[in-house]
Structure formats: structure tokens, C-alpha cells
Amino acid sequence: MTTPQYRQVPAQVDLPALEHAVLDFWREQKIFAKSLEQSEGRPEWVFYEGPPTANGMPGAHHIEARVFKDVFPRFRTMRGYHVGRKAGWDCHGLPVELAVEKELGFSGKQDIEAYGIAEFNAKCRESVTRHTDAFEELTTRMGYWADLQDPYRTMDPEYIESVWWSLKEIFNKGLLVQDHRVAPWCPRCGTGLSDHELAQGYETVVDPSVYVRFPLTSGPLAGEAALVVWTTTPWTLVSNTAVAAHPDVTYVVATDGEEKLVVAEPLLAKALGEGWETTGQSFTGAEMERWTYQRPFELVEFPEPAHYVVNADYVTTEDGTGLVHQSPAFGEDDLKVCRAYGLPVVNPVRPDGTFEEDVPLVGGVFFKKADEKLTEDLETRGLLFKHIPYEHSYPHCWRCHTALLYYAQPSWYIRTTAIKDRLLQENEKTNWFPDAVKHGRYGDWLNNNIDWALSRNRYWGTPLPIWRCAEDHLTVVGSRAELTELSGTDQSSLDPHRPFIDDVTFTCAQEGCSLEAVRVPEVIDAWYDSGSMPFAQWGYPYKNKELFESRYPAQFISEAIDQTRGWFYTLMAVGTLVFDKSSYENVVCLGHILAEDGRKMSKHLGNILQPIPLMDQHGADAVRWFMAAGGSPWAARRVGHGTIQEVVRKTLLTYWNTVAFQALYARTTGWAPSEADPAPADRPVLDRWLLSELHALTDQVTQALDAYDTQRAGKLLSAFVDDLSNWYVRRSRRRFWQGDKAALRTLHEVVETVTKLMAPLTPFITERVWQDLVVPVTPGAPESVHLSSWPEADLTAIDPELSKQMVLVRRLVELGRATRAESGVKTRQPLSRALIAVAGFDTLSPELHSQITEELNVASLASLSEVGGSLVDTTAKANFRALGKRFGKRVQDVAKAVAAADAAALSLALREGTASVEVDGETVTLAPDEVIITETPREGWSVASDSGATVALDLELTEELRRAGLARDAIRLIQEARKNSGLDVADRIALRWTATDPATIAALTDHSGLISDEVLATDFAQGEADDSYGAPFTDEGLSLVFRLRKQ
């Protein structure tokens, strides 16, 4: 029976090529399907996929969210859960319509209706599936496991029926209403927008800021003074209806000697500037109520009396003049105030944003372009007090970037304000990552919640399922089956989109009414579609009832931070409206992806990174690791080739090199795991330390991923892989050469566990390692790492004391290396001894001592106390920065005490922990960071100290030490020659050498056994080589020439 063996692992790895091979393996072996089948019956861990719209090509930012949406389902699957991963597509909405309009060369709704709604919607349907292949390619290439074969689509009839059902539920609760309100309106798209859409489209603009005189025509100041009103929207002055004043604010009359103006007292200087003084007259806003004034423009007719001062509590004295122009057709607060006074609502602006043609001066002009003409007219008539350009943030359409106007119109609203308290309660139950979003960005959003403007005057969307008769009786339909019953005709195959749904009528369902009911013309906000996906993806409640109920709410969702006002909000709002419970429990908010130069990625700047080429250059694992662990996931991050290459170099290649090292020496020595391998307790201290660190790592990484902290998990893994390679493997290299079973078994166990821990983050490289190092030598091993179980940390196997001691060992090694470098004595040159002074040195075992002596290449270690203070001259002085925080003004007194103290005694005390000095009769305790100790080595010694630790190297070289150093130089040269000759690490060699320097001859002669062992020479002799040996290698420094051949 042959011994099982690792597969051969190449020293160099091509990550993209490796990943394509792994993709083939997953596909051929149906690994994703097996992971779902294997976990059937386990507890559900529910994840919701936020649906993208596939009417455009995917970008680098699509990778980011997909990384997190893959990491945690993989992690939870390995932890023993069943994690369904249904993919989805967002199909409806204004972005889709605008893209199709652009393709067809349309300029607005009139072109769509001339073309035909059915034909236009057919184009939209085709558009949203145009790039699904590209999205699926991205999803597959990056290793994001999702069910792409059975996705939900928001345009499918069953999905729409579920949405209808939910709207009927909301209507029956009295929360879906039609109202005439001022709401954001896009004149280009001809539709209203919801508050969360509005939040996504602010742009910085410069508008005219005008201060306008409104001459008073009644009250005590009639004919002699004017109100001064400030606005940044001069175009709304055409329909000015009133001026609002706060009832409790004092308004003063000011004069410059020529005219009198009325402004709020706190804003006198700010609004009017220098040269204005009060006349002594003042009035409260309440006293000014119903004073009439001359309106700024008489371009439109008013059906009822208007144009007087009204009182409003929302008026402030922070900006402007304290007097606010009211135009109720274009302002929500204005509408409320004017309604309370019974004032008319006059709207001279058409839905396309242009003034009615019969409006003098600005007829047919787009509202924003009317500002200039109107301002000039005010100035000509002497009503313009001053005009200042004003830079501010103004709402624009989040898709077409047209300036919005607030527009009074009838729309359908969901009364989310009625469930505000429930939303806040659900938010309290939700875990946000980062936590600051909970009561910050998202909490503020909920606290300022306004009713959801649901309806859209558009075409490609879920039709609002409300039918109305001429008597305004409303019937809300929840399914096509219900529509069949109401209409008396079979609607089971009906496409529920416009215009087909518009053709369905029925007799009003209101008892006693026989009028025809016709569907209202609007469609709904596409954000409601995506917010309904938890139940609509299953066609609930008409099918999959138990399935949905077992998968609501989600344990986890993740998208970019801007979704706090998008999908995160609509998911919570719809869930709470319909089920009185939020749709999710944990949400990870991701920062935006920027170009390497810190700017936003855009075609215009030419700094877009295409996702597939990016992964084919660096590897998907490298991109995934960067996204998950290359910085705070919730902060904006710069992505570029350089940053990703650093990830590959620092972590992934180090991991791979360690795996290749293990495979090489296990195959070379014929080792495979067996029961004959030493038990952990019987292995050397370095093995025991590594296994202790491994269990600690497992515990810490598990905790980090449980807390959705991929950055911390990545840092832990990266640091461990670095320690594994640059400390454990390097320190144990000779043991691996010798086929040491304890070392090989230890590294095997560590690689297997680390591979599992890294698998959710880097699924490709870990799969390859699993196939190469685990499956071949482990009977019954799962065929994929992604079918394996998450490792369990054995907390009893963690040795905190050993960990602490190894930290000390490595600290002393670093100090020793530093002082060697400073002395100029190379590491290959053996030294006789190192003296150590540090707290805890006496607790180190002989095994740990040997780690230090071998690393520092010294023959022995001893405590510095054995030779007293003769090695260094010691000085001590105060660290003012550290002491100043504690002692403030007394720091000078403490500094003098430190300077007067015995510096050597202070140094010794600080190594043990703390030191003390007398200051004005008081004993003051000092910490190591509060005193700067300087130790100057005496001749023949090299000394380094840091934070209470000192390493002193004896630099005196005997002839024996010099010869040993030369022997090590020769070993290095021969190892390089072996490598350059193309020999395998296990190949034995014969070597012939000659030298002219007596020191070199003596060194190679005295240390021939050591050299032979190190370079695997079975025949090592001085003398000329025959022609069977290779070309000569020469080193002038050693005056050495040698030739070698494979045995």
C-alpha cells in the first residue's frame, strides 16, 4: 500500500490561472449545490441579496458589496447553518426609462406616448436583461456563490402580485392615501420623487440670492415703509401669496435717511448692512399679522384676496431678514401656512418646468432660467434691495440631474410618519456596522421621517393597484386572481404592466355603486419593489408561505453607505408597515470605492477599473482580500493596482510560500500525517507555541467574523501568516530539511486550520491548498474546503504564559539584531556571548534560550547582572512629553530629581517595572516611558536598549570564532551555487574546493562536518575537481574556488 502524499505545489503561483482551474473544479463537481444540499435541515441563517439593475455594465464598486455578501454566507455555512443565496434583479424604475429614452432619442414623456407605452415598456424589459451575462460573469469570476439559475425579478408577475398584496395590506391599515401636497418634482422626467430619492441627488450650485422690497399698503406703516424679503428662488415670486413672520419675533423699522425698511431685529445689521439705524419703531410678528403689501409681480391672477402678512412658527432669525416669502404651490411649509389662512394656491409653472405661455415676461421659460429676467425687472422697478450670488446645495434628479422644483400636486403617499415610533424601535433592535450609523446617519433619517411619496407618473414600474369610480370609491386589488373575480374575465395570464393593466375595468366594488372602476394612472416608486423582496421573491402570500416565514427577517444584509436612504430604509419601512417587524437584524454599511488618486471613478476622468480585467491581472482573491481586510470597510477607500499588489505580496504569497515549503519537504522526506507523529505535548517548544497561537487565532478570528469585522479578521490572519513564515518556518528550517515529524505535523495542522479560516475571504487559493495538502493525505476529508466545518478553538490549548515568553524572546532577538547591525558585525559571524537585562528573563526555559542564541548566533546567554554596570555608561533624563501629562507645572521638579538620581539604578528598576525618585519630600513613581535611559557601550561591546530591555553583545573575536564565521560564509556561497545549479533541495552533492587564504583553509577544514550537513554534501574534500564536476564558483573575499556535482 502506497503512502498518501501531498500533491506537488509549485514555488511560484499564478493566482488568476489557479482561480480559473478552481472555477472549473467547482462547476464540474457542483460544489455550491453540494454545500446547499449538505446543509439542508440545519438552522437557517438568512441573507438577502440587494438586487442590481442590469441595464448597465458592472463596475469595480459591484465587487465590494459582493465580497461581503459572499464572505459571511460562506462563514455561516461552515459554522453549521443553511444559508440560501437567491440572486435577484431590480428591473423597474426611472433609471431604466431614462436609458431607453436616450437610446430612442426621446426628450420626454410626449415622445414615449407617441411611440406607444406597450412598445416603450417592451424596450425597457429588454434593457434590464441586456447585461445580466456580464453581471453573472462578474459574480462567478469573483467566487460569489449565489443562485443565478432561479433569481427573483421585480418585473415578474408573481413578484408584482406580492407587491400588490402588501400595498392592499397597507391601504387597509389606513396608511396608503392620496393627498395634494408639495413634493419634489422632476420636470424632465415628469414625475414626483420620494424623500429618499431626493437625498441622493443634491448638487452644489450658485443661485441668485435676492433681497426684495414689498411696500406695505395697510397698517401703521402703510405708504412709508417696505418689508424686506430674502429668497434664493426669484422665480417663485411670480406666485407670491403671503409673507410669513414669526409671531414672537420683534421686527424693527430701519432707515438710511431716504427710505424705511422692516426686518427682524436680530438680522438688522446682517440683512441691511452699514448705514442703517432703527427709527425706534418696532412690532411683533403677531402685531403685523394681516398687514397688506404690494406684491412683487402682477403677472398672474389670484382668484381670492391674498398678499398679506401671516404668522408661522417655522420662521427663524438665522438667515435672511426674518420675513419669509410664501408661494404655496412650491413649498411644503408655505402650503401648510397658507391653507391655515384659506389663501389660494396659484401655480403658473407647468409640469415640464416652464411657465405657462400666457405669463408675461417669462412665458414658456424654464423656471431656473427665469431668475435672471425677473431679477432685472425687480431692479428696474426699484424693488430689488440687493442681489448676491449664493452657493448652496440644491436638489437635482438623482438620475437625469435636472434641477428639481417643489410642486403642489395630488400624489399617493404611504403614511410612514404614522409608524415613526415603530421604525425607531426596530432600529434600536438592529445591529449596525459601523455602530455610529444607527443613531447618526440612519437614526437622523428616521427622526426626520416624512411620508413616502409612493406614486410616479411614469410607465415602466409596478402599477399602483387602485381602481377608482366616478364617485371616488377606491378598490385596492391584491392579485390577478382577485382581478379575475372583480372583472369577470380570466386575468391569470395578464401582464400586470402598463398599458395592459390599464385596460382592465370592473364594476365598482362599493356596495350599492354600479359605476365603472378604472385604474389610477400611476406606477409606484421602484424602491418599494426592492424593499418588498423579502416576501415578493417567494410570491408570498400566494405560495411558499412557510418558506418565507422561516426566512424572515434576514440575519444579514450589506450594501454601500448611501443605501441608508435607499434599500436599507425601504426594507425596514416595508417590513414594519406590513409585518410590524424590520426585514433585517444586522447590516454592514460599506464605504465608497475611489480611484487610487482619491477621486471618484468616472469615465470622464479615465480612472475606472473594470472588474474582470482587474481580477484577471491580480486574482479575485487579491481583490477580495483588499476589499474585506485592506482597511476599514465602512470608510471610503482608494483602489488601484499598487494597493492590490501589496495585498498579494504581503499575505497571499506569504501563505502560498509556506504551503509550498511544507509540500516540498513533506514530499522530499516521504512524510504524511500518521498516528505515529508526536502528540502536541511531546513536541518542541516552538511547535507548542505555534499551536497555542493557532487556537488563539481561531478564537479571535471567529469572534471578529461573528461581529462582522473582516478588517480585524484579516489583520489577525495576516499577522499570523507573517509570524508563521518569518518566525516559525525560518526558525525550524533545519528540522524540515531533516524530515522532523513534529515540525511537519505541526505545520500541517496549522496550514489546514488557517486554510479554513481564510476560506470565506479567499475561496480560491484556499481551495487549491485544500486539494493539494489536505484531501490527498486525509481519509474522509470533504472534497472542498467549502464543504468543511469551521475550526473550533480549544481554549485549554492556549498557553498565555508561553505566548508572553515568546513575545519576550522575539523582542530580545530584535534588540540583538539591531545592536549587531549598529556594530557592523554580520549575523553569520558567531560571537561568544550575549548578556541580557529584562524583566522575565529568568523565567525563560533552556529551549527558549536556544531560540535566542541561534537567532543572534552567539554561543551563550547570561544575565547582565553577572557583570554589573561595567558594559555601559548610563544616563537618565525626563521624558517631558510623558511626564507633562501627569505632573503639569511640577514637571521641572520631577525632571531635576531624575537627573540627580543614580542613572544605573533607575535603569535597573525600570527594567523590573517602575522606579521612584524623591520630589520635595514626596516619593514619585515613574513608568518606563516617562524616563529616557541612554546607555553608551564600552569598548568591545555593542549594546541596545528599549523600554526596559537591554541586549549586550561581546564583540571580541577569537580565532576559533573567526574560523566559524568563515565557515558560515562558505555555507552561504555553496547554498547559492546549489540553487543556481538547479538542484532540488533534497539532492546530495559532491564538492571539491581550493583556497589560498590560510584562514579559509583552516575554517573549511575544521568545520567540514558542519558544512557537509548544511549543504547536503556526502563527499566534501579539498583538492582539484575532475571534469565530472560543474563549472567553478569563485569568491575573492574568501579566496575560495569550488565545484560541485549531484551525487
Swiss-Prot record:
GO BP: isoleucyl-tRNA aminoacylation
Cofactors, names only: Zn(2+)
Motif ('HIGH' region) on chain: 52-62
Binding locations of ATP: K603
Known EC number: 6.1.1.5
Family: Belongs to the class-I aminoacyl-tRNA synthetase family. IleS type 2 subfamily.
Oligomer status and interactors: Monomer.
Domain notes: IleRS has two distinct active sites: one for aminoacylation and one for editing. The misactivated valine is translocated from the active site to the editing site, which sterically excludes the correctly activated isoleucine. The single editing site contains two valyl binding pockets, one specific for each substrate (Val-AMP or Val-tRNA(Ile)).
NCBIfam families, per the entry: ileS
Full protein name: Isoleucine--tRNA ligase
Organism: Streptomyces coelicolor (strain ATCC BAA-471 / A3(2) / M145)
